[in-house]
Each structure stands twice: as structure tokens, then as C-alpha cells.
């Protein structure tokens, strides 16, 4: 054996080891999500009935929100959805720091907009029938990768689904996987809540959808689930159609089931509301329950605040109390996450505020 070769190998090995360590540390840092102490702003995503597109708004204090792009859409629904429109956007920051957008592939005014000949995609499948979701993943909220997911293709049992609505994402710590959950009904039956695991690329399911929660009376629809882990409990707020549509809460020790029914109504609204979303105030032990007040003539978001998930203070609706908007009205089905200053600055640089 060539002794020069031996010396060269001996000399290079420590360098290779050091490179591997540096790369490993760099990857570890890149995959570590920022913590609450790093956060300085709030990002709200929502859709608009006029555009059926994704909109975003920012707030530095959690009380006053300003829409990006002067209130215009950030991502046009007709560029990403099979039905040429999206509804019910939800945003989630994964444990590795990436952002996950999940949306309903549905345009309820597609006929008027000239996207289809009939009012709905299929006859005899009821209001707002659809079969798909739009899933998007981004490292920075600017560059997005998209997948269109058809739920009726997941198993023979799902071929007759009447809707797939309001998808949301969370991380199941026990399974160590991303989990999406959504509203689904068969034909025109009462809707129930389902979940499935999704791959890291956020473009395909890794399990067949299973029941997450159904109302005790199976003839009553349960929809629009929103799961938040607080302490060691998973708190799921959802919509019940047990009378006037409103918000109820169910609690479990795990993400993917076991939720205990609570008959109490948690919203203070006299008219129908839907789309609950819970978000925490930065640096405080306070959580905001936000919901879409759709049963009134002018749609709006309503807000209630809690420290213990038992007692809730009614904060009123946008521009009727302490919660304000500056340049948009009638948002639909929203969700809120925290952002760092750097992430906020990048969004403002891209879209303007």
C-alpha cells in the first residue's frame, strides 16, 4: 500500500468528521422551529366569498389586523384548485418549522363565475359538494409546494362522499406524524369528523381516513374541528348543528380520538357561527377562540378569550369591540399563527402592508 495514501487518509478523516458534525448541527438548527419567545406578530389566513382565494393579514399586537397586498388575494383559488376556488384555509407551523396550508377545494359560486355549467359538481349530493383538498407546504411563507388530494380515491368506502371540508393539520406526538383532520359526509348524510396521517412532503396520505369524532346523535352534523394542545390535553372546538349552528368543545388525552362530548355551547352569538380557531396571545396565558359569524346579514369574525377553557370573555366581533381590521371586511373561515420578526418582515417586503 502506498504510504502517501495512508497519510492522506489519516489527514482527511478528522476533516471529514468535522464537516459531518458541522452539517449535522446546521441541519438540526434548520429543522428546529422557533419558540414563543421568538415570536413578535400574528398571521391570519382566511378566504373571501368574492374571490374564493387565500388572503393574509398581519397584527403586531393581536388586536388590530391589516391585510397584506392591500386586501387582495395572496394565492388565487383558480390557480390551485380543481373547482377553481378554495375555502376554509388553515395554517400550521410544524415541529420542524415548516408551514402547512390546508384548504377545501370548493367554489360555491363556480356556475356564476363560468367555471362549471351546473350549480354543484354533482347532482343529488347536496350543498357545497366536493371531493378534494388543497395541501401546500412552505419553508418561508413565500415559496409554496402544492398537492391536490382527492379523498374519494383513498378507499372504496369513500367513493360516494358528499363533501370534504375544512381540513386542518396538527402533529400527533404519540404517532410522531403529521395528522390532517377534516369534515366528511357520505352522500347527503350527516357530516362527521375524520383524520388521517400525511407524509412529510404533505402531498399524500399515509393512512386511510378514520373517524375522529361524531356527535352522540348520529343524525346531527359535526364539522369544522380545530385541535389545540394545552398542557397535556387536546382541546377540540367544533361546530354542531344541534339547533342553531354554534361552537362546542370536546377534550381528549390524545390527538386522534377519545374526545369527550360536552353539551355546552361556547360561543356567545345569537346567530349561527362556524369555523372555530384557537390561538394564544404571545407571552400571556390567554387564548382566543375565533369563529365565523355567518348567520348574520354581514359576515364577520367573533372572538372570545379564556385563561382556563371554562370561562370565556366575549370580545365582540371585528370593529365592534377591541378587535379591529384596518383594510378588509367580511373575512371567512380564518386561522391564526405566530410569526417571528424576520418572517413578518419578509411577508411585508413581498406583499406590502
Question: What name fits each language-model region?
Answer:
Residues 31-353:
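Carbohydrate-active catalytic/glycan-binding domains of CAZyme proteins
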Residues 1-34:
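Bacterial Sec-dependent N-terminal signal peptides
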Amino acid at each position: 500500500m502506498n504510504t502517501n495514501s495512508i497519510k492522506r487518509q489519516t489527514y482527511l478523516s478528522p476533516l471529514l468528521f468535522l464537516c459531518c458534525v458541522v452539517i449535522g448541527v446546521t441541519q438540526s438548527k434548520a429543522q428546529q422551529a422557533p419558540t414563543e419567545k421568538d415570536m413578535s406578530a400574528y398571521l391570519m389566513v382566511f378566504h373571501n366569498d368574492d374571490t374564493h382565494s387565500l388572503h393574509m393579514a398581519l397584527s403586531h399586537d393581536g388586536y388590530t389586523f391589516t391585510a397584506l397586498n392591500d386586501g387582495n388575494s395572496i394565492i388565487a383559488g383558480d390557480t390551485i384548485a380543481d373547482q377553481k376556488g378554495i375555502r376554509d384555509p388553515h395554517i400550521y407551523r410544524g415541529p420542524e418549522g415548516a408551514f402547512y396550508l390546508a384548504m377545501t377545494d370548493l367554489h360555491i359560486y363556480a356556475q356564476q363565475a363560468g367555471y362549471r355549467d351546473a350549480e354543484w359538481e354533482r347532482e343529488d349530493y347536496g350543498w357545497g359538494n366536493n371531493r378534494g383538498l388543497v395541501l401546500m407546504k412552505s419553508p418561508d411563507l413565500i415559496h409554496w409546494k402544492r398537492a391536490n388530494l382527492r379523498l374519494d380515491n383513498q378507499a372504496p368506502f369513500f367513493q360516494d362522499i358528499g363533501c370534504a371540508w375544512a381540513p386542518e393539520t396538527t402533529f400527533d406526538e404519540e404517532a410522531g406524524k403529521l395528522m390532517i383532520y377534516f369534515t366528511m359526509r357520505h352522500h347527503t348524510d350527516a357530516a362527521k369528523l375524520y383524520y388521517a396521517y400525511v407524509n412529510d412532503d404533505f402531498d399524500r396520505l399515509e393512512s386511510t381516513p378514520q373517524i375522529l369524532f361524531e356527535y352522540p346523535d348520529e343524525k346531527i352534523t359535526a364539522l369544522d374541528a380545530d385541535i389545540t394542545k394545552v398542557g397535556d390535553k387536546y382541546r377540540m372546538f367544533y361546530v354542531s348543528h344541534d339547533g342553531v349552528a354554534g361552537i362546542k368543545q370536546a377534550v381528549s388525552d390524545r390527538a386522534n380520538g377519545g374526545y369527550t362530548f360536552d353539551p355546552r355551547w361556547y360561543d356567545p352569538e345569537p346567530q349561527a357561527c362556524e369555523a372555530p380557531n384557537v390561538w394564544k396571545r404571545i407571552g400571556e396565558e390567554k387564548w382566543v377562540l375565533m369563529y365565523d359569524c355567518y348567520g348574520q346579514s354581514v359576515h364577520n369574525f367573533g372572538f372570545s378569550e379564556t385563561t382556563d377553557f371554562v370561562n370565556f370573555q366575549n370580545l365582540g366581533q371585528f370593529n365592534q369591540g377591541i378587535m379591529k381590521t384596518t383594510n378588509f371586511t367580511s373575512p371567512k373561515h380564518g386561522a391564526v399563527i405566530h410569526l417571528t420578526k424576520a418572517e413578518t418582515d419578509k411577508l411585508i417586503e413581498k406583499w406590502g402592508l
